[in-house]
Amino acid sequence: MWKKLGRKISTTVKDDPEKHSQIYVPNPVIVPGGRFREFYYWDSYWTIEGLLLSGMNQTVKGMLENFLMMVKDYGMVPNGGRIYYTRRSQPPYLIPMFKLYMDHHFDQDFLRDNIELLEKEFLFWHNERQVKVQDRKGMTHHVAQYRVNVSDPRPESYREDYALAQDLATEEEKQQLYVELKSGAESGWDYSTRWFVNNETNNGTMKDTNVTSIVPVDLNSLLCVNAQTLSYFYNRLGMHDKKREYDRIAEEKNITMSKIFWDQTDGVWYDYDLNAKSRRRYFYMSNLHPIWSGCYGPEGSRARTMEKLIKYLNNKGVLKYDGGMPTSLEDSGQQWDFPNAWAPLQHLAIMGLYEARNIHHAAEELSFELAEKWIRTNWKGYQELHAMFEKYNVTVVGKAGGGGEYEVQPGFGWSNGVAMRLLELFGDRLTPTEGNSAASPTLSLALGLLMGLLSLGVRSQFF
């Protein structure tokens, strides 16, 4: 598995950069798979989960060094490993990646040598992607959004973007659409009705993409936990003034989760519409990100918050599907919508519920139920097609997802990493099919998928 996805960038890229679109990095990388032949930023968090479980600490350290080098060169981590990606990023999971590595192999010198670069990446999002929002009481909150102020088509999808914009009336409208499409790519959710704004609804087409008018709940939840993690890192280094600084930033962001994103009536967090000055009350799996980050907001009981959230999920009917939780309930033909399910979103929801097991009695069992559904759909797809896919269809167990701008891709880095993490956590309880009573069903499912994933010898430290 990892051998198939491993790449080493040729030194010719370093020696003659004008002849190549790749970004040179010194250490080996893991690519997602399929058509994606370069590394990508946020994918790597879940890939690293799997690499660490495979004992590949040195490979992970090398990947982190690559990302840190890019922060030094570009001020942030680019979307992916191509020169044309350097003007946009992706969801900032570098600090959580670093924390995963530190949790497996704490390296004080590595942390000390790179803490300034970790902070530099945080400040890119904290400053360069910041907007101000007022809550109902007139208090100002600093929030972040995906916003790429580059007004030409995406280089990797130039033809599609150019064609989409052709019937717009003015050059300014075309340029703004290009900004929105690039901002959607920066979000990682390219594309979804989540970013459609049409008369203050999410009904529309790709031309209604308006990412820069939306404040994403998951991005701000992620920056909250990033601030908490920086505080932890500074404390480990004995840098107590910096620890207190990031304690304050984290607390401000935690308050914002309550004041801007939390909907007390529905019992969930939502994206915020800057123009309408209101929350966008639609189901997207991004709404659940705060249960993974732990940034629930300081108000009220966490147990009560979890109770309301589980009720919300039941009321929305998103727990009824055998193939996992859908990305949204909007059947738009976009890949980050119904009926698709994505490994990173399943992981965030499952792990968030699992971490809440001591907060609410139902959270751990729901976490297990979702994990079991996800592993079953991975296993069935692997049995039938001998591949792991980037996305799956929640309505048919084992079926690959579809929609969007390209065919579903096999590989697949983050799907592999999530499966390995869930097998590690729940492997002793999983069953291959609902109601299965065969001997040792947990062993057959867990070992079957794990052996498939490990069939190319992931335990070998190949780099």
Question: What residues fall within each predicted segment?
Answer:
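Extended glycan-interaction surfaces of carbohydrate-active proteins
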Residues: M1-E38, G62-L68, Y74-V77, G81, ...
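Short amphipathic alpha-helical coiled-coil/interface segments
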Residues: L118-F122, K243-S258, S367-I375
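C-terminal GPI-anchoring signal of eukaryotic secretory precursors
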Residues: D428-G448
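Alpha-helical support elements that line or immediately flank enzyme active sites
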Residues: Y40-M70, S286-P298, H347-I359
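Aromatic/His-enriched, Gly/Pro-containing loop or helix-boundary segments
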Residues: V71-N114
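TPR repeat positional signature
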Residues: S44, I95-F98, N220, C224-A227, ...
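Inter-helical turn/loop segments and adjacent helix faces that build the functional surface
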Residues: Y101-D113, L230-E245, A356-A362
